[in-house]
Amino acid sequence: MSQANLSETLFKPRFKHPETSTLVRRFSAGKPQAMQSALSGNHVDHWYRLINRLMWIWRGVTPQEILDVQARIVMSEAERTDPELFDTVIGYRGGNWIFEWAKEAMQWQQKAGQEADPLLSGRHWLHASNLYSIAAYPHIKGDELAEQAQALANRAYEEAAQRLPGSLRELEFTIPGGSPITGFLHMPKGDGPFPTVLMCGGLDSLQTDYYNLYENYFSPLGIAMLTIDMPSIGFSSKWTLNQDTSLLHQHALRHLENVPWVDHTRVAAFGFRFGANIAVRLGYLEPQRLKAVACLGPVVHGLLVDPLHQGRVPEMYLDVLASRLGMHDASDEALRVELNRYSLKTQGLLGRRCPTPMLSGFWKDDPFSPEEESRLITSSSADGKLLEIPFNPVYRNFDHALRQIARWINHRFG
């Protein structure tokens, strides 16, 4: 089936689809405050979703494109679940978040199909993949339209990978007691086996969101990157996140000694946000398989155990946590009790000495991940490095931090 036909088949006009903000039915205790975070985006009035401009621009979406799509959503007069929230238009139609971002993606998909230059066509496919991923954001389980957008993001990513430099292989990993999962191994030019970074993304992202990380930071150093979806989304959608947060990534890590393109003696883990929970956990459980662990804005303890901290983060993020845990109808109190078990300190790991070298980067006053979170990680490591990232200029400092982290990992590979 052609990509255009697939889009038409998946996105038939229907108005019965549940609207994203209604899928998690937690008891909300109050009105969220405005919030700004480099890594997770801004919570601004009248939007349910966090507007994550830094990460979207970093992935290749232009600021103008973001504003254009937002404007179409704002201007819509269609019925909304909450009249106060722009991005709650009901049904797949003009003004609906998924509709508008998928419509933008389809334009780039069409450009890709018409472009004769393979490299440029690959860029267009990658752009379409990023836009489909934003359409599906924040990837809440049971969001039918979002799951269709995820499927299109993955298809577009596969098309892009065939045309862009280097090579990409889809690897299937068998997980005992459940469905296998698929990961993408991105490899630079040259002969392998390559030192490899296992990417552990955030709870509100797909594994296809990190191509830029590979292309601009790891590939130039001759490092490959393996991505895996977080439990309950994408290729890992049949799994629910549980207290053994690193289960899927751990099985993938153990399998790498059987992958001929990977130098399994030189593997590191890199975690964004909750992905750092997985990466640090692996640092404790698999020190013989990991040369290093790096984290950015980690969520490993504070947010998971402190109700006041939880009260400072937006509803959307708590909805995402509840969704990953399969707690769509839980009270806030039940969610708090469960989240406490996901703290790596509560689990008896953080605070104990870990032989794996660990770097943790943080932004001052980050509502998701205060400085103490990163200090807890680095002070627990026999070879810890703390990296403070100045907030402004936000894009340049983010880029600089990623370059420092890539060099640090490369140095640990030896």
UniProtKB/Swiss-Prot annotation:
UniProt keyword Cell inner membrane present: no
Superkingdom of the organism of origin: Bacteria
The protein's enzyme class: hydrolase
EC number: 3.1.1.1
Name of protein: Esterase FrsA
Catalytic activity: a carboxylic ester + H2O = an alcohol + a carboxylate + H(+)
UniProt gene name: frsA
Role noted for this protein: Catalyzes the hydrolysis of esters.
Disulfide pairings: none
Segments crossing the lipid bilayer: none
Matching InterPro entries: AB_hydrolase_fold (IPR029058), FrsA (IPR043423), FrsA-like (IPR010520), FrsA_esterase (IPR050261)
Family label: Belongs to the FrsA family.
GO molecular function: carboxylesterase activity
Keywords: Hydrolase, Serine esterase
UniProt entry tagged with the keyword Metal-binding: no
Pfam families in the cross-refs: FrsA-like (PF06500)
Source organism of the structure: Klebsiella pneumoniae (strain 342)
